[in-house]
């Protein structure tokens, strides 16, 4: 399980098939990965590590898009499938599958501007056995920074 939380964000329709959920990198308040039981570990995940993990391996999110739930501060929920992730120096953008993107609390989708959005990402990637892969992806993404030590819990 991954949890990505920001202080603000937006939903934009980008075509017949997709929406995008975007927020400024500066608005990111938490990005956390949890392992499955029995290990029950958790890790802070810097944006560059999340981006590196997106395409890493045969079971990557790029190869098998994850299910997700997006919640805004009013408690409304939207179920979606994440089909893309782009992180640059300014923003984090997830691509949402249109057919899966729907609100379960009302007839309308979440509003265009979101306050305190939280994205819950379902993942079989982060099992106890997958921790080594997480650390490898983190090491590659963080080679030039100190965030690798954070992945190790230092």
Question: Where are the regions that the model predicts?
Answer:
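Acidic, glycine-rich low-complexity segments with interspersed aromatic residues
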Residues: 1-74
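Helix-rich interaction surfaces within compact, conserved domain-sized segments
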Residues: 2-5, 95-136
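A generic structural motif
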Residues: 21-23, 90-99
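Exposed beta-strand and adjacent loop surfaces of beta-rich binding modules
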Residues: 65-67, 79, 116-118
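Hydrophobic residues positioned within well-ordered beta-strands of beta-sheet architectures
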Residues: 68, 80, 92-94
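Short beta-strand-centered aromatic/proline hotspots
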Residues: 77-86
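Sequence contexts marking disulfide-bonded cysteines in secreted/extracellular proteins
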Residues: 141-148
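Extracellular/cell-surface secretome signature
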Residues: 152-154
């Amino acid at each position: 399980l991954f949890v990505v939380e920001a202080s603000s964000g937006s939903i934009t329709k980008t075509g017949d098939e997709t929406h995008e959920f975007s927020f400024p990198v500066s608005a990111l308040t938490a990005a956390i990965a949890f392992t499955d039981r029995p290990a029950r570990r958790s890790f802070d995940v810097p944006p560059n590590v999340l981006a590196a993990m997106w395409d890493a391996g045969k079971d990557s999110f790029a190869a098998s898009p994850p299910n997700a739930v997006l919640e805004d501060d009013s408690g409304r929920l939207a179920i979606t499938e994440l089909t893309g992730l782009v992180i640059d120096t300014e923003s984090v953008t997830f691509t949402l599958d249109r057919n899966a993107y729907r609100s379960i609390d009302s007839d309308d989708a979440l509003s265009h501007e979101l306050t305190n959005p939280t994205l819950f990402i379902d993942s079989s990637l982060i099992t106890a056995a997958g921790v080594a892969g997480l650390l490898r992806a983190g090491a590659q993404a963080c080679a030039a920074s100190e965030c690798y030590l954070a992945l190790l819990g230092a």
